[in-house]
């Protein structure tokens, strides 16, 4: 796959249940980046996708790693992604985990997941997509007219605000008052 295209970006992420445990990143993250640099032109930027904490009521295996506590999992993910950005030659962080946590402070509440860990197919995925947009294009997504069919204007606004706030402050939760 790496040789198939002239990539601008190559994204990496840790498995969600391990995403807050930095010890599970190494030596694999370092080795993956080294492999990419050998097989892909240096112009391709490596980005790291920060995953999200599970829903409070998740029964997903691995949630025990965080005492089945959403904020504990979120804080661990933030620490691990911060450490990855500090110790590896990664160009950009896509803070989807922070965007999802931001959205959870809104009227969405803890409804961002459809099954306790995968994102809701509509506003959960849209919030993550908005985060990718804000970071990759280095501009606010607020006001972008695109939204999936079935979203209300308020849902669009919450998702866009959550993503923009995460792009500005990738390691802290911003309260969304909608």
Residue ranges and their predicted role:
Residues 2-122, 134, 143:
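Alpha-helical cap/lid subdomain in secreted, periplasmic
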Residues 112, 116-119, 123-125, 129-178:
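Conserved catalytic region of serine esterases and O-acyltransferases that act on ester linkages
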């Amino acid at each position: 796959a790496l040789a198939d295209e002239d990539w601008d970006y190559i994204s990496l992420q840790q498995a969600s249940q391990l995403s807050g445990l930095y010890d599970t990143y190494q030596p694999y993250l370092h080795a993956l980046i080294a492999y990419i640099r050998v097989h892909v032109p240096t112009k391709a930027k490596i980005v790291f996708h920060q995953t999200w904490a599970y829903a409070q009521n998740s029964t997903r295996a691995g949630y025990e790693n965080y005492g089945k506590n959403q904020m504990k999992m979120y804080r661990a993910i933030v620490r691990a992604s911060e450490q990855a950005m500090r110790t590896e030659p990664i160009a950009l962080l896509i803070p989807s985990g922070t965007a999802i946590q931001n959205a959870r402070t809104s009227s969405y509440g803890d409804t961002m997941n459809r099954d306790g860990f995968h994102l809701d197919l509509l506003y959960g995925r849209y919030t993550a997509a908005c985060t990718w947009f804000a970071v990759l294009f280095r501009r606010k997504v607020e006001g972008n007219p695109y939204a999936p069919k079935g979203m209300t204007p308020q849902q669009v606004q919450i998702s866009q605000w959550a993503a923009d706030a995460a792009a500005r402050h990738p390691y802290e939760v911003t309260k969304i008052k909608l």
